[in-house]
Amino acid sequence: YLPMINALARAGHHVIYCNSRFRGTDSALLMEKVVQDLGAAIKDAKDRLGYAKVVLAGWSGGGSLSMFYQQQAQHPTVTASPSGDGPDLTTLGLIPADGIMLLAAHISRHGTLTEWLDASILDESDPTRRDPGLDLYNPDNPNQPPYSAEFLARYREAQIDRNRRITAWVKGKLAELRAAGRPDDEFGFVVHGTMADPRWLDPAVDPND
C-alpha cells in the first residue's frame, strides 16, 4: 500500500515487499523473529533469485527494523528477546544488506512508544489517577506550551519511569505464568494514555527543519 513500492517498480527497479509472520498482529510481535524473517527474505533474494545486491528500504518502523537487522547481521549480539523468547540472532548467519534506504523512519519502536506515553498516569489499573502537573491535556495545568526545558526534562523522565513500571509488571506476570507451568498463556492488558507527546502541542520541541 506504500506508493514508493509501485513507483520503484514502474521505474524499472526490482522490488520485493517483505512481511513478517506477525502481519496484522503487532500485539504478539517479537522483533527478533521479525529480524529472522527479514533475513530469510534477503537470503532467498540472493540464493534462490540470484540477486547480487539487495538494498533494504525501510518505511516508518521498517526503518529502525532495517538498521537493527543490519547491525545484527554485521555484529550479532542479541541472543534472546527482552522476554527471554525469540531466536538467538548470533546463530542465524544473517546476510548484511548491500545498502539501506530510510523513508520517514522513526528511531525505534521502544523509543517512539515511550515518547508517546502519558506521563501523568500514576496507576495502570486506574488511569484517572494522574499527576495534574504532568497532564498535557489538563487546561488547569500551569505547564502550557511553549514548554520550558525543565518541564520537558521532568516529563520525559516520568515517561521512562512509567515505561519501567509497566515493564516490571509484565516481567513479573511472565514469571508467574512460567512458575505456574503455563508459559504459553496469553494475558492481555491495556496501556492507557498513548497519545501524549509534548512535540504534538509545542512545535518548538521538534521543529521541522
Regions found by a protein language model. Name each.
Residues 1:
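Active-site glycine-rich loops that stabilize anionic/oxyanionic intermediates
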Residues 4, 34-41, 61, 65:
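Generic hydrophobic, aliphatic-rich segments that mediate packing or membrane embedding
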Residues 5-25:
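Conserved alpha/beta-hydrolase
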Residues 18-24, 48, 86-87, 130-143:
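Short C-terminal domain-edge/linker segments immediately following a structured domain
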Residues 21-55, 75:
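Catalytic nucleophile-loop/oxyanion-hole region of alpha/beta-hydrolase
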Residues 30-33, 55-61, 140-152:
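Noncatalytic linker/hinge segments flanking ATPase motor cores
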Residues 44-47, 52-125:
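Primarily recognizes the serine-hydrolase "nucleophile elbow" in alpha/beta-hydrolase
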Residues 91-209:
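Alpha/beta-hydrolase-fold enzymes
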